[in-house]
């Protein structure tokens, strides 16, 4: 990877604000999470612009490529260049990925199939199968049987210690990778919950971790996109602090992924795998 123009941003901006409590007002310094447009470019063709916290962008780009099915494995990404443009009225970044020709040809074909659609990208599609929402059913690797009874409680207890940016801003999501005991091995924060997960998946891909031998713990709600991304890369369980959506539950059950939500040290709700 090459990194151009500037060092990686901190993820936080300090701003002067007026803070009011009751009848009193004062000038203070507030910390807010950075949000940049990040362009993802595959083999010279711009594919998407995502709004992200501008940290860990190499991991984010790889995780996005894998979890969205653009590439099948990390080795399909041959080169990554991250360009940070922090000066000017609109700071932004561009990530250039060079992928194998087979993956690029499939991406171009997918883009042609989507060309001409308007609106949300879902309207007008004839069947849910064409949405590519439900990945292949996950094999039973035995991980869930090895999961410690207090693993979810441990992850819930440990997550705040890995949320340094959230402690300062109150406005970021976290995605953590946990082992069978619930110990947190990796954790990433981002302004977008799906971005945080992509950063985590990218790191697991780049380090060649066994994604069938752990689970994801998220500080957010469980949306369909988080479940779909996790199932696509073979993660057997997703745990979230907040509520799931009905589509997230349906996708999890069809994929054979265990989804647990409302996770706290005291308990959780298990939405099952079947």
Swiss-Prot record:
GO terms for biological process: Mo-molybdopterin cofactor biosynthetic process. GO terms for molecular function: sulfur carrier activity; sulfurtransferase activity. It is found in: Cytoplasm. The active site is at residue 120. Keywords: Cytoplasm, Molybdenum cofactor biosynthesis. GO terms for cellular component: cytoplasm. Pfam families: FdhD-NarQ. Belongs to the FdhD family. HAMAP family: FdhD. Required for formate dehydrogenase (FDH) activity. Acts as a sulfur carrier protein that transfers sulfur from IscS to the molybdenum cofactor prior to its insertion into FDH. This is Sulfur carrier protein FdhD. It comes from Burkholderia mallei (strain ATCC 23344). The gene is fdhD.
